[in-house]
């Protein structure tokens, strides 16, 4: 899943900016204070990564409008179907038919390379927010289509402050296998799109296996069941007997929260080779934090599967000397072959691996408003960056 078209109106210093034909990498270059970060923030707002604030509105207080076009591949669509997003149909053909009804602005596209057909499609919509805090997703058919928000791609963002802990947590989630992801989601053992309601109908299936044969997800369900038996079964039975005796007609259902999120949380510390002590990430120097960030991203590029996410980084070159800046550019290039990358920079050292279609120059017009130049001239950009 990736952005292919962007149109931003009335967001901070942006009056009207259009970026067409966006590829797997979108590199926003320009001098300081030209509005590169503003474009990234606008995308994060429209894609639900950050909330709208009062400072995001122009001086005239008009509505913010951020129109986007998202490309969805066949793998993206199958992933949405498997997770029960947009529609509850389990068979893909039925799911896709319902998907198109609920998202009428989705346009299927079929391309052939002579041997196989590449199935994909584009979804167009406009995020609109007013100064009263109300927001909606307009798709040209419905004033507010609630289904759009359900399929927006995950955003992994890195600000100049280098909030590495958040990015690390996100990337570790991507490295875990499907079983751990299911444990986190709280889904049913038999149906991923269904939320577990602690009916424990899966216990019969689990009991047919030897302990060594259980996977992590099945073992967690068995733990749920044993904890329930230990703590709640008799209590629940007594409460329901008294509830019915006193006129109650429904059933009281108890469940135990094992706080899977905390149980599966990974702690990262920096160990010293010379001293027997560890330090937290927050105690690292700025240069080392940037190097660790690059190491995280490089590990991310080694993942085999294509992921429905967009990585947004402000000034990857920050705190890095020129040699490491070039390394950062190489890592970002490899990363963009896996999924979409959007980053800002005013360092020419990061541009060597990218083509002119992936680089857009951000400048100020005569009124001090941010604009994106239609044609990319690398020599002009390099002169501008110095």
Describe the role of every protein-language-model region.
Residues 1-48, 265-386:
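Switch/communication elements of ASCE P-loop NTPase nucleotide-binding domains
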Residues 40-116:
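Conserved P-loop NTP-binding catalytic core
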Residues 52-56, 140-144, 344-347:
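Short beta-alpha junctions and helix-cap segments that line functional grooves
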Residues 61-66, 72, 122-123, 151-155, ...:
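Short glycine-/polar-rich loops that comprise or flank the Walker A/P-loop
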Residues 68-72, 159-162, 272-274, 363:
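Flexible glycine-/small-residue-rich
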Residues 75-80, 165-169, 350-353, 368-373:
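Switch/connector loops and helix/strand junctions flanking conserved nucleotide-binding motifs
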Residues 83-202:
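A sensor for short, sequence-defined functional sites
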Residues 169-292, 296-310:
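Extended helical coiled-coil dimerization/tether regions that scaffold
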């Amino acid at each position: 899943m990736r952005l292919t078209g962007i149109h931003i109106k009335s967001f901070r210093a942006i009056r009207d900016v259009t970026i067409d034909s966006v590829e797997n990498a979108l590199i926003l270059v320009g001098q300081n204070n030209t509005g590169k970060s503003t474009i990234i923030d606008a995308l994060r707002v429209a894609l639900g990564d950050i909330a709208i604030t009062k400072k995001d509105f122009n001086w005239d207080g008009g509505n913010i409008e951020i129109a986007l076009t998202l490309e969805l591949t066949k793998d993206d669509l199958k992933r949405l179907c498997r997770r029960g997003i947009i529609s509850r149909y389990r068979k893909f053909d039925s799911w896709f038919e319902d998907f198109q009804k609920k998202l009428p602005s989705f346009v299927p596209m079929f391309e052939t390379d002579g041997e196989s057909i590449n199935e994909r499609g584009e979804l167009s919509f406009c995020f609109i927010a007013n100064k009263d805090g109300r927001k909606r997703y307009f798709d040209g058919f419905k004033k507010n289509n609630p289904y759009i928000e359900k399929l927006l791609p995950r955003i992994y963002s890195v600000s100049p402050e280098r909030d590495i802990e958040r990015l690390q947590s996100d990337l570790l989630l991507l490295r875990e296998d499907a079983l751990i992801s299911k444990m986190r989601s709280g889904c049913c053992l038999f149906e991923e799109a269904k939320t577990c309601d602690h009916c424990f109908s899966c216990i019969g299936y689990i009991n047919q296996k030897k302990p060594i044969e259980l996977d992590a997800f099945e073992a967690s369900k068995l733990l749920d069941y044993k904890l329930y038996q230990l703590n709640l079964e008799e209590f629940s039975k007594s409460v329901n007997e008294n509830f019915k005796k006193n006129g109650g007609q429904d059933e009281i259902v108890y469940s135990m929260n094992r706080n899977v999120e905390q149980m599966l949380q990974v702690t990262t510390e920096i160990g010293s080779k010379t001293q027997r002590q560890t330090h937290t990430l927050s105690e690292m120097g700025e240069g080392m934090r940037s190097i660790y960030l690059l190491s995280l991203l490089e590990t991310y590029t080694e993942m085999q599967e294509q992921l429905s996410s967009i990585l947004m980084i402000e000034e990857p070159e920050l705190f890095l000397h020129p040699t490491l800046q070039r390394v950062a550019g190489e890592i970002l290039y490899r990363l963009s072959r896996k999924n979409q990358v959007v980053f800002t920079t005013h360092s020419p050292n990061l541009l060597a691996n990218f083509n002119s279609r992936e680089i857009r120059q951000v400048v100020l017009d005569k009124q001090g408003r941010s604009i994106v130049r239609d044609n990319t001239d690398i020599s002009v950009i390099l002169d501008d960056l110095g």
